[in-house]
């Protein structure tokens, strides 16, 4: 049996020697050694990546949910909105850098270095006594989150095309189980113990993960990718350093500006926000022009990717927009739970459990739909149905009000059911259409575009909500107070207190009674209901885009083959040139004949 290599991969102008070695390193599932996927190096590496993914998203979600308690300990800060933003920005930059660099220098050094950086960040976090120190820790942890965000690549490239999702599912299974629990555990640790244990847990898990990586994870090395005639110094000279500087600066400035904007102390028209967004956007425009017209030898984002409109471009659009729709769910739904159902929930634990139902839905969808992906086939129709499903249930989420709590739980689960599955599919599909020597760079563009697009639409979602709520509140409050005897002259004071969202401020007003307070609480919940409905209408409108993109996408079923792009090697064989015939994994006769002709 010969190696199955897709013939129509995106041509990113690879060197002939690199293309030949990529084909030599590839194999098919049938040609792998017996028991390969049960070998210690595979089991240990998969366990390490699984542990890293769990630790990575646990520290983010748990610390974000415990942020009010953390601020009580280290002191309040006007930069509290940056806590998660710096993490997200760090991960986006890390994944984008990972793409081209690991294609050229190998995955192993990047994975080990980012794990070590994560340990340093967690140590800084667990010892922090000032909030700015915590921000530095979250930045380091965000950059260290690159391997977790790139796990569909690192695991997918070790599996055959038709079993990539099963491999990813094995690694993601613990994440599915813990994803919804992380916010709850973060609050419980902060309330009943110490929030610093969030970072301690990360340190424990990440230490085990990096130990397993160092011992067992040996993907193709620099020598295997390029042979022994090419030096790392020569490759470093070809790195697109100008592109790296431009994309890091542009992405960081733009994401910070978008995330900061709309805050009470940073309105959208403030000089700080306008300056960050405009300078970031301008830098990214310069980056794009440089990549197209500067013609770097190893561009960070090859312009030729975008020539494949029915393949790469459609995948990129679907991933970015559905990721943004996912954000509308995971950001807005927990706020809905607090603002609409807060008065009817018994305690913070019940609130935390109800807020996690959307996450439980995403986990269930990954397990159920991911297991069937390669069996159902008809890839673009699967994505089309998923996009229509998500759009329909996001629209249904607009019907949530204070009288249908059970419906809210059910709808949040059903809405989340397809969203993580759809995002994972796009990050696997991009590996189908790319030649094996360029898997990282194509994957990185798709993976990094999600947080970038997500930050833009998140700002838009929040802007829709914050602009709508005061108007809805004035209407509902005025209607609810008729006949209650509340003084008309005090209405403006009541309106301002209600805008804060705090019932303590409402109850502190002169002349406030228990009955009127209850009426105000219900009016506030109804105002929140109407405001969030507009956000879901917006998200539902976005759903038309991935629906159209999935219809335009070409049929990719032909790529569901036994082709395996890369393998893990024994340590003693990890630096041997496969074309010299002394590697543990021998190239196929076809590949050797190609090498002889050269």
Curated annotation (Swiss-Prot):
One Pfam family matching this protein: TRI12
Result of knocking out the encoding gene: Results in both reduced growth on complex media and reduced levels of trichothecene production.
Disulfide topology: none
Q: What induces it?
A: Expression is positively regulated by the trichothecene cluster-specific transcription activator TRI10.
Which region ranges are annotated with the description Disordered?
579-598
**PROSITE patterns xrefs:** MFS
User: Which residue ranges run through the membrane?
Assistant: 42-62, 109-129, 135-155, 165-185, 197-217, 241-261, 273-293, 312-332, 356-376, 381-401, 409-429, 442-462, 533-553
List the signal peptide residues.
none
GO MF terms listed in the record are: transmembrane transporter activity
- Glycan-modified residues: 79, 161
Give the record's GO CC terms.
plasma membrane
Q: Which UniProt keywords apply?
A: Cell membrane, Glycoprotein, Membrane, Transmembrane, Transmembrane helix, Transport, Virulence
Q: Which family does it belong to?
A: Belongs to the major facilitator superfamily.
What is the official name of this protein in its record? Trichothecene efflux pump TRI12
Biological source species: Fusarium sporotrichioides
């Amino acid at each position: 049996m010969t190696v199955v290599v897709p013939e129509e991969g995106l041509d990113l102008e690879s060197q002939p020697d690199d293309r030949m070695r990529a084909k030599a390193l590839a194999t098919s599932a049938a040609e792998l050694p017996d028991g390969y996927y049960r070998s210690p190096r595979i089991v240990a590496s998969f366990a390490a990546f699984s542990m890293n993914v769990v630790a990575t998203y646990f520290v983010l979600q748990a610390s974000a949910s415990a942020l009010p308690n953390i601020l009580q300990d280290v002191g309040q800060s006007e930069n509290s909105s940056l806590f998660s933003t710096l993490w997200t920005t760090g991960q986006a930059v890390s994944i984008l850098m990972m793409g081209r660099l690991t294609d050229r220098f190998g995955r192993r050094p990047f994975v080990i270095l980012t794990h070590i950086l994560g340990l340093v960040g967690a140590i800084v976090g667990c010892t922090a006594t000032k909030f700015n120190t915590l921000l530095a820790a979250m930045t380091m942890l965000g950059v260290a989150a690159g391997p977790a965000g790139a796990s569909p690549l690192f695991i997918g490239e070790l599996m055959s095309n038709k079993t990539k999702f099963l491999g990813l599912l094995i690694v993601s299974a613990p994440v599915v189980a813990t994803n919804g629990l992380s916010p709850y555990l973060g609050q419980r640790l902060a309330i009943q113990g110490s929030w610093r244990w969030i970072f301690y847990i990360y340190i424990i898990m990440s230490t085990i993960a990096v130990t397993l990586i160092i011992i067992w994870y040996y993907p193709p090395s620099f020598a295997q990718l390029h042979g022994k005639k090419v030096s790392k110094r020569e490759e470093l000279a070809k790195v697109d350093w100008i592109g790296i500087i431009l994309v890091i600066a542009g992405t960081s400035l733009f994401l910070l500006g978008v995330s900061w904007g709309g805050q009470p102390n940073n309105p959208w028209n403030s000089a700080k926000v306008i300056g960050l967004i405009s300078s970031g956007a301008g830098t990214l425009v310069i980056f794009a022009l440089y990549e197209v017209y500067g013609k770097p030898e190893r561009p960070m984002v090859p312009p030729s990717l975008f020539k494949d409109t029915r393949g790469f471009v459609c995948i990129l659009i679907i991933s970015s927009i559905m990721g943004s729709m996912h954000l509308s769910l995971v950001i807005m739904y927990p706020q809905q739970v607090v603002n609409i159902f807060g008065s009817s929930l018994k305690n913070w634990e019940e609130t935390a459990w109800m807020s996690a139902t959307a996450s439980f839905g995403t986990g269930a969808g990954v397990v159920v739909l991911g297991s069937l992906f390669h069996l159902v086939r008809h890839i673009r129709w699967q994505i089309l149905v998923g996009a229509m499903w998500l759009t329909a249930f996001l629209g249904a989420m607009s019907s949530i009000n204070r009288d249908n709590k059970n419906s809210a739980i059910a709808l949040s689960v059903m809405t989340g059911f397809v969203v993580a599955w759809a995002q994972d599919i796009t990050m696997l599909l991009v590996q189908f259409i790319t030649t094996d020597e360029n898997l990282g760079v194509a994957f990185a563009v798709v993976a990094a575009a999600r947080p970038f697009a997500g930050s833009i639409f998140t700002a838009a979602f929040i802007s829709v909500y914050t602009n709508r709520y005061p108007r809805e509140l004035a209407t509902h409050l005025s209607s609810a107070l008729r006949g209650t005897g509340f003084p008309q002259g005090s209405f403006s004071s009541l309106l301002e207190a209600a805008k804060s969202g705090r019932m303590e401020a409402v109850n502190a007003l002169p002349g406030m009674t228990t009955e009127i307070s209850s009426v105000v609480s219900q009016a506030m919940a109804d105002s929140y209901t109407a405001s969030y409905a507009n956000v879901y209408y917006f998200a539902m409108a976005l759903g038309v885009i991935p629906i159209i993109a999935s219809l335009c996408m070409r049929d990719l079923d032909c790529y569901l083959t036994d082709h395996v792009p890369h393998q893990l090697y024994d340590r003693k064989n990890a630096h041997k040139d496969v074309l010299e015939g002394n590697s543990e994994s021998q190239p196929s006769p076809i590949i050797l004949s190609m090498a002889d002709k050269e």
